[in-house]
Swiss-Prot record:
Catalytic activity: 1-(5-phospho-beta-D-ribosyl)-5'-AMP + H2O = 1-(5-phospho-beta-D-ribosyl)-5-[(5-phospho-beta-D-ribosylamino)methylideneamino]imidazole-4-carboxamide
Name the UniProt record assigns to this protein: Phosphoribosyl-AMP cyclohydrolase
Binding site for Mg(2+): D78, D80, D82
Organism: Clostridium acetobutylicum (strain ATCC 824 / DSM 792 / JCM 1419 / IAM 19013 / LMG 5710 / NBRC 13948 / NRRL B-527 / VKM B-1787 / 2291 / W)
Broad class of enzyme this protein falls into: hydrolase
GO CC annotation, single: cytoplasm
Cofactor annotation remark: Binds 1 Mg(2+) ion per subunit.
Transmembrane segments: none
Length: 115
């Protein structure tokens, strides 16, 4: 039932949708991956994140090989229905590099320029 309600609000007309994954406790953005309808269904059904790998052309469950699972706490849908925000309880690292977040490289701007 939950899946059907979510699907009614989604627009998969372009095939894949971006899925932003965020830590439910502290709001940190952990990663971005892509989902199709089946990946979203698996995510809702199992309460763990599933994605579609564009390079391998197959489904993958975050944590299946590493043990670094993402347990779904909530799913938000953007205004156009073509992007979702998944808030999770992250176990271990979210990034394949071993970093907690895939966004571990950043630039800070001061007075209009990067420092």
């Amino acid at each position: 039932m939950e899946y059907k309600k979510i699907l009614e609000m989604m627009d998969f007309s372009k095939g894949l949708i971006p899925a932003i994954v965020q830590d439910d406790e502290n709001g940190e953005v952990l990663m971005l991956a892509y989902m199709n309808e089946e990946a979203l269904k698996r995510t809702v059904d199992t309460k763990r994140t599933w994605f579609w790998s564009r390079s391998r052309k197959s489904y993958w469950n975050k944590g299946e090989t590493s043990g670094h699972f993402q347990y779904v706490k909530s799913i938000g849908i953007d205004c156009d229905g073509d992007t979702i925000l998944i808030k999770v309880k992250q176990v271990g690292a979210a990034c394949h590099t071993g970093n907690r977040s895939c966004f571990y490289r950043s630039f800070e701007f001061e007075d209009g320029g990067a420092k």
